[in-house]
Amino acid sequence: MANWLNQLQSLLGQSSSSTSSSADQGLVKLLVPGALGGLAGLLVANKSARKLLTKYGTNALLVGGGAVAGTVLWNKYKDKIRAAHQDEPQFGAQSTPLDERTARLILALVFAAKSDGHIDAKERAAIDQQLRGAGVEEQGRVLIEQAIEQPLDPQRLATGVRNEEEALEIYFLSCAAIDIDHFMERSYLNALGDALKIPQDVRDGIERDLEQQKRTLAE
C-alpha cells in the first residue's frame, strides 16, 4: 500500500498492518485507538463535532460493535440495514478492500464537513497547510483536495458499499461530523441515508445518540 495512504490511515486511526481479514471485522478493527481525531481536527470546523470525533478517536470509535449505541443495538442496526438490502443477493457477501474503504471514509468526512456549503479558499489553504504539517504526502493531500472540489454526491459514497457494516460506518461518521443546524445539512443526511438504504428508525437512533454525546461534551 502506498505510503501516503498509510499516512491517511494513521490519521484515521487505521493500522497500516491491517489485513483483509481484520477489515472484515468492521470499525472495531478499522478505527482503532487514536482514530479519527487527527483527520477530523483538520477538516471539521464545528467544535462539538470535532470534540466528539476526537473522543472516539482516543477511545476507539466503536468498542465491541458500538460505543455510542451499545453492541446489542448496533447489531440490531446492522440487521435492519441488511433487511433493507434483501433484494441485493450479493450484499453482505464480502467486504471492500481496506484501501478503498479508507478513501471512502475520507470522502465521507470531507462531504460532511462541507455539507453546509462552507469550505472556502481560505479554509482550503488552512487545511492544506495542516496536512503538510501532519506530514501527509502530496498524493494524500491531492485525494482530500479532490474530495473538497467534488460536488456533494451521497450516491457516490453508497456506490460500492458491500455490506451493512460499511453502510453504517459511513452514516455514523457523517452524523458525527455534522451538527444539524441548517437545512442543507439535513438535506444531505437525508439523501445519504436514502442512498445507503438506512431505515429511518436507525437514522433517528444514531442521530439521537450522537446528539446526546455532543451535549455531554459541551457541558
Curated annotation (Swiss-Prot):
Topological category with respect to the lipid bilayer: Single-pass membrane protein
All ranges on the Cytoplasmic side of the membrane: 75-219
A Gene Ontology term for the protein's cellular component: plasma membrane
Topology feature Periplasmic, residues: 1-51
Annotated transmembrane regions: 52-74
Keywords annotated in UniProt: Cell inner membrane, Cell membrane, Membrane, Transmembrane, Transmembrane helix
Pfam family, any one: DUF533
Record InterPro entries: TerB-like, YebE
Coiled-coil region(s): none
Localization in the cell: Cell inner membrane
Domain of life assignment: Bacteria
Main localisation: membrane
Name this protein carries in UniProt: Inner membrane protein YebE
Source organism of the structure: Escherichia coli (strain K12)
